[in-house]
Amino acid sequence: MKYLAAVGIALASLSAAAHAQSRTVFDVMESRGDLLGWEAVGRLDMPHGFCTGALVGRDLVLTAAHCVFDPDTGQPYAARGMTFRAGYHHGGSITERPVARWAVPDRYAAGMAEAGSMTSGEAVATDVALLRLAQPVSSAEADPFRVHETPSPGTRVSVVSYGRGREEVLSREPDCEVTQRYRHDVLGFDCDVTFGSSGAPVFVRENDRLRILSVISSGNARGEAYGPSLPALVSELRQRLNREDARPKVTTGARRIT
């Protein structure tokens, strides 16, 4: 496996990738009917911008870890300041939910606490966040996607996202592929990405069903994108959120003993 020596993560590199966008033909979902089958992909709105996210459970949204940190200060966003808007389209959405809490890998959180930013290949490998919604999304509104195991280079993939210049509509880049698997389980793709594409699901088709292979972490001006391998990280974060939910609620007059 090759070592990803210096991948510029998050918004810094995605700004450069915006120049490559003009080379790519996106399937822009201009009408509500175009969203059929993609209802579980949505826009994650935060105090200072937005990312793309996707449901992987009735009350779980998958996105990139750097989306839940302020890019200027490196401080984590409060969950109450985030809203997931499934199937967002020109100001409306199929449904929307506030975020109740979120979790990122310990290694990513430690790096942000120490340096205020993450710019290494290892950072891309842990650039995953799982968000617990305040209320679940019903099956009548959107069906969550499942996470796929890591494929081999050459596997065809597609990226579904919001982005700069297409903030109000969901778009799909239908024709890119896995180009490389690097050290730390970082995956490379020949997909063009830009601001807002952070956290966008990278889809692979398995037995005629779409599965999420990765999420967009970063990209460059050459039309290359990078993202982490998901299964182990998503499992870890899901378990952590479940443990937190199982803790006794602290009420007035009571004190939690840890």
Kindly label every feature range from the protein language model.
Residues 37-83:
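Catalytic histidine site
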Residues 54, 71-73, 109-122, 129-165:
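Active-site substrate-binding loop(s) of clan PA
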Residues 42-44, 79-89, 155-161:
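Short conserved beta-strand and strand-loop elements enriched in small hydrophobics
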Residues 21-36, 50, 75-137:
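Conserved catalytic-core segment of clan PA serine endopeptidases
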Residues 64-67, 213-222:
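Short beta->alpha transition motifs characteristic of CBS
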Residues 34-37, 47, 55-56, 75-78, ...:
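Extracellular/periplasmic catalytic domains that process cell-envelope and extracellular macromolecules
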Residues 54-55, 192-216:
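Catalytic nucleophile loop of clan PA
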Residues 3-12, 16-56, 106, 171-174, ...:
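Protease-domain processing segments flanking chymotrypsin-fold serine proteases, especially trypsin-like
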